[in-house]
Amino acid sequence: MATDYLERGALAGLAGGLCYGLFQATVGNSFTVGVETFESGHSHGGGPVVDGVTTAAVSVGGGVLWGLLFGIAVFGIGYYFLEPALPGSGVTGRLALAAAGFLTVSGAPWLVLPPQPPGFEQALATDTRLALYAGTMGVGALVSTACVLAYRRTANRQTAVRTLATALPLALLAVAVALAPANPVTGPVPATLAAAYRWTVVFGQVGLWATIAAVHGWLGEPELTTAELSYPTSAD
Protein backbone atom coordinates (compact mmCIF):
# COMPACT_ATOMS: atom_id res chain seq x y z
CA MET A 1 0.00 0.00 0.00
CA ALA A 2 2.90 2.36 0.70
CA THR A 3 3.96 1.88 -2.91
CA ASP A 4 0.57 3.19 -4.06
CA TYR A 5 1.09 6.35 -2.00
CA LEU A 6 4.53 6.88 -3.53
CA GLU A 7 3.21 6.31 -7.05
CA ARG A 8 0.35 8.76 -6.60
CA GLY A 9 2.68 11.30 -5.06
CA ALA A 10 5.08 10.91 -7.97
CA LEU A 11 2.30 11.26 -10.56
CA ALA A 12 0.91 14.35 -8.85
CA GLY A 13 4.40 15.80 -8.56
CA LEU A 14 5.11 15.08 -12.22
CA ALA A 15 1.94 16.91 -13.30
CA GLY A 16 2.54 19.82 -10.95
CA GLY A 17 6.20 20.06 -11.91
CA LEU A 18 5.37 20.04 -15.61
CA CYS A 19 2.90 22.90 -15.17
CA TYR A 20 5.40 24.78 -13.05
CA GLY A 21 8.17 24.21 -15.58
CA LEU A 22 5.99 25.47 -18.41
CA PHE A 23 5.11 28.53 -16.35
CA GLN A 24 8.79 29.20 -15.77
CA ALA A 25 9.66 28.61 -19.42
CA THR A 26 7.10 31.17 -20.57
CA VAL A 27 6.23 33.75 -17.94
CA GLY A 28 9.17 33.33 -15.57
CA ASN A 29 11.91 33.34 -18.20
CA SER A 30 10.36 36.27 -20.05
CA PHE A 31 10.27 38.25 -16.83
CA THR A 32 13.88 37.36 -16.06
CA VAL A 33 14.98 38.39 -19.55
CA GLY A 34 13.21 41.72 -19.10
CA VAL A 35 14.96 42.30 -15.78
CA GLU A 36 18.34 41.37 -17.25
CA THR A 37 17.72 43.64 -20.24
CA PHE A 38 16.94 46.51 -17.89
CA GLU A 39 20.08 45.71 -15.91
CA SER A 40 22.27 45.56 -19.03
CA GLY A 41 21.22 49.09 -19.87
CA HIS A 42 23.02 50.22 -16.71
CA SER A 43 26.21 48.25 -17.35
CA HIS A 44 28.90 48.26 -20.01
CA GLY A 45 29.59 44.55 -20.25
CA GLY A 46 27.63 41.75 -21.85
CA GLY A 47 27.35 38.15 -20.73
CA PRO A 48 27.08 35.02 -22.83
CA VAL A 49 23.86 34.56 -24.73
CA VAL A 50 22.00 31.33 -24.00
CA ASP A 51 19.67 29.84 -26.60
CA GLY A 52 16.01 30.32 -25.73
CA VAL A 53 15.12 26.69 -26.42
CA THR A 54 17.88 25.52 -24.10
CA THR A 55 16.71 27.86 -21.35
CA ALA A 56 13.12 26.67 -21.75
CA ALA A 57 14.19 23.02 -21.66
CA VAL A 58 16.20 23.60 -18.49
CA SER A 59 13.23 25.39 -16.89
CA VAL A 60 10.81 22.59 -17.73
CA GLY A 61 13.25 19.93 -16.59
CA GLY A 62 13.96 21.77 -13.37
CA GLY A 63 10.26 22.23 -12.72
CA VAL A 64 9.60 18.52 -13.20
CA LEU A 65 12.40 17.64 -10.78
CA TRP A 66 11.05 20.02 -8.14
CA GLY A 67 7.56 18.63 -8.66
CA LEU A 68 8.75 15.04 -8.28
CA LEU A 69 10.67 15.94 -5.13
CA PHE A 70 7.70 17.63 -3.49
CA GLY A 71 5.25 15.04 -4.79
CA ILE A 72 7.16 12.03 -3.51
CA ALA A 73 8.41 13.56 -0.25
CA VAL A 74 5.26 15.43 0.78
CA PHE A 75 2.33 13.77 -1.01
CA GLY A 76 3.86 10.31 -1.09
CA ILE A 77 5.73 9.77 2.16
CA GLY A 78 4.23 12.70 4.08
CA TYR A 79 0.62 11.98 3.14
CA TYR A 80 1.07 8.30 4.02
CA PHE A 81 1.97 9.15 7.62
CA LEU A 82 0.05 12.41 8.12
CA GLU A 83 -3.27 11.61 6.43
CA PRO A 84 -5.15 10.85 9.69
CA ALA A 85 -3.96 14.13 11.24
CA LEU A 86 -4.78 16.42 8.31
CA PRO A 87 -7.72 18.81 8.73
CA GLY A 88 -10.74 17.95 6.66
CA SER A 89 -10.82 15.14 4.14
CA GLY A 90 -10.30 14.66 0.44
CA VAL A 91 -9.18 17.79 -1.38
CA THR A 92 -9.37 19.88 1.81
CA GLY A 93 -6.76 17.76 3.55
CA ARG A 94 -4.52 17.81 0.50
CA LEU A 95 -4.75 21.59 0.20
CA ALA A 96 -3.87 21.87 3.89
CA LEU A 97 -0.83 19.67 3.29
CA ALA A 98 0.13 21.78 0.26
CA ALA A 99 -0.21 24.97 2.31
CA ALA A 100 2.00 23.49 5.03
CA GLY A 101 4.55 22.44 2.42
CA PHE A 102 4.62 25.87 0.81
CA LEU A 103 4.87 27.62 4.16
CA THR A 104 7.76 25.40 5.23
CA VAL A 105 9.77 25.33 2.01
CA SER A 106 9.18 28.84 0.69
CA GLY A 107 6.63 30.98 2.53
CA ALA A 108 8.31 31.36 5.91
CA PRO A 109 11.87 31.74 4.54
CA TRP A 110 10.73 34.32 1.98
CA LEU A 111 9.35 36.54 4.72
CA VAL A 112 12.97 37.00 5.82
CA LEU A 113 14.83 36.38 2.55
CA PRO A 114 12.50 37.17 -0.35
CA PRO A 115 13.56 36.07 -3.85
CA GLN A 116 15.70 38.69 -5.54
CA PRO A 117 15.91 39.62 -9.24
CA PRO A 118 19.15 38.85 -11.12
CA GLY A 119 21.95 41.29 -10.41
CA PHE A 120 20.86 42.23 -6.89
CA GLU A 121 23.54 42.25 -4.20
CA GLN A 122 22.63 41.20 -0.65
CA ALA A 123 24.30 42.42 2.52
CA LEU A 124 24.33 39.09 4.36
CA ALA A 125 26.95 36.50 3.45
CA THR A 126 25.88 33.37 1.59
CA ASP A 127 26.53 31.06 4.56
CA THR A 128 24.50 33.33 6.81
CA ARG A 129 21.60 33.37 4.36
CA LEU A 130 21.66 29.58 4.04
CA ALA A 131 21.58 29.14 7.81
CA LEU A 132 18.81 31.72 8.11
CA TYR A 133 16.81 30.02 5.36
CA ALA A 134 17.13 26.63 7.07
CA GLY A 135 16.11 28.11 10.40
CA THR A 136 13.01 29.77 8.99
CA MET A 137 12.09 26.49 7.28
CA GLY A 138 12.07 24.96 10.75
CA VAL A 139 9.86 27.79 11.99
CA GLY A 140 7.50 27.22 9.07
CA ALA A 141 7.26 23.52 9.89
CA LEU A 142 6.54 24.26 13.56
CA VAL A 143 3.89 26.83 12.68
CA SER A 144 2.23 24.42 10.24
CA THR A 145 2.16 21.72 12.91
CA ALA A 146 0.73 24.15 15.46
CA CYS A 147 -2.03 25.16 13.03
CA VAL A 148 -3.04 21.53 12.49
CA LEU A 149 -3.02 20.79 16.22
CA ALA A 150 -5.12 23.88 16.93
CA TYR A 151 -7.60 22.82 14.26
CA ARG A 152 -7.97 19.35 15.76
CA ARG A 153 -8.22 20.56 19.36
CA THR A 154 -11.07 22.92 18.50
CA ALA A 155 -13.08 20.32 16.60
CA ASN A 156 -16.16 20.84 18.78
CA ARG A 157 -16.03 24.63 18.81
CA GLN A 158 -17.83 27.14 16.61
CA THR A 159 -16.47 27.75 13.13
CA ALA A 160 -15.26 31.26 13.96
CA VAL A 161 -13.40 30.05 17.06
CA ARG A 162 -11.88 27.17 15.16
CA THR A 163 -10.74 29.40 12.31
CA LEU A 164 -9.18 31.91 14.69
CA ALA A 165 -7.40 29.19 16.66
CA THR A 166 -6.07 27.61 13.48
CA ALA A 167 -4.70 30.91 12.16
CA LEU A 168 -3.30 32.12 15.49
CA PRO A 169 0.04 30.24 15.23
CA LEU A 170 0.80 32.21 12.06
CA ALA A 171 1.59 35.15 14.34
CA LEU A 172 4.80 33.33 15.26
CA LEU A 173 6.06 34.14 11.77
CA ALA A 174 6.04 37.82 12.68
CA VAL A 175 8.29 37.02 15.64
CA ALA A 176 10.74 35.22 13.37
CA VAL A 177 10.79 38.17 10.98
CA ALA A 178 11.38 40.63 13.83
CA LEU A 179 14.27 38.60 15.25
CA ALA A 180 15.96 37.92 11.90
CA PRO A 181 18.95 40.08 10.94
CA ALA A 182 18.37 42.73 8.30
CA ASN A 183 19.48 41.94 4.75
CA PRO A 184 19.59 45.17 2.71
CA VAL A 185 19.74 44.62 -1.05
CA THR A 186 20.91 46.86 -3.86
CA GLY A 187 20.33 46.57 -7.58
CA PRO A 188 19.68 48.52 -10.77
CA VAL A 189 16.05 47.39 -11.07
CA PRO A 190 13.31 49.76 -9.81
CA ALA A 191 11.48 48.71 -6.66
CA THR A 192 8.18 48.17 -8.50
CA LEU A 193 9.80 45.85 -11.05
CA ALA A 194 11.63 43.96 -8.31
CA ALA A 195 8.36 43.54 -6.40
CA ALA A 196 6.62 42.25 -9.53
CA TYR A 197 9.45 39.76 -10.04
CA ARG A 198 9.09 38.47 -6.48
CA TRP A 199 5.33 38.08 -6.77
CA THR A 200 5.81 36.16 -10.02
CA VAL A 201 8.10 33.74 -8.20
CA VAL A 202 5.59 33.40 -5.36
CA PHE A 203 2.73 32.80 -7.80
CA GLY A 204 4.71 30.07 -9.52
CA GLN A 205 5.42 28.26 -6.25
CA VAL A 206 1.81 28.55 -5.07
CA GLY A 207 0.66 27.19 -8.41
CA LEU A 208 3.08 24.28 -8.12
CA TRP A 209 1.80 23.21 -4.71
CA ALA A 210 -1.85 23.79 -5.62
CA THR A 211 -1.53 21.74 -8.82
CA ILE A 212 0.12 18.85 -6.98
CA ALA A 213 -2.67 18.89 -4.39
CA ALA A 214 -5.40 19.05 -7.05
CA VAL A 215 -3.96 16.20 -9.13
CA HIS A 216 -3.36 14.12 -6.01
CA GLY A 217 -6.98 14.63 -5.03
CA TRP A 218 -8.12 13.73 -8.55
CA LEU A 219 -6.18 10.47 -8.33
CA GLY A 220 -8.19 9.55 -5.24
CA GLU A 221 -7.26 7.33 -2.34
CA PRO A 222 -5.13 4.21 -2.79
CA GLU A 223 -7.25 1.09 -2.88
CA LEU A 224 -6.72 -1.46 -0.15
CA THR A 225 -5.35 -4.75 -1.35
CA THR A 226 -7.14 -8.03 -0.74
CA ALA A 227 -4.57 -8.98 1.88
CA GLU A 228 -5.26 -5.77 3.80
CA LEU A 229 -9.01 -6.30 3.66
CA SER A 230 -8.96 -9.93 4.76
CA TYR A 231 -9.18 -10.92 8.39
CA PRO A 232 -7.43 -13.90 9.96
CA THR A 233 -9.66 -16.91 10.32
CA SER A 234 -10.17 -18.33 13.77
CA ALA A 235 -8.95 -21.80 14.49
CA ASP A 236 -11.55 -24.48 14.86
State the predicted function of each range:
Residues 1-236:
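Juxtamembrane/disordered regions of integral membrane proteins
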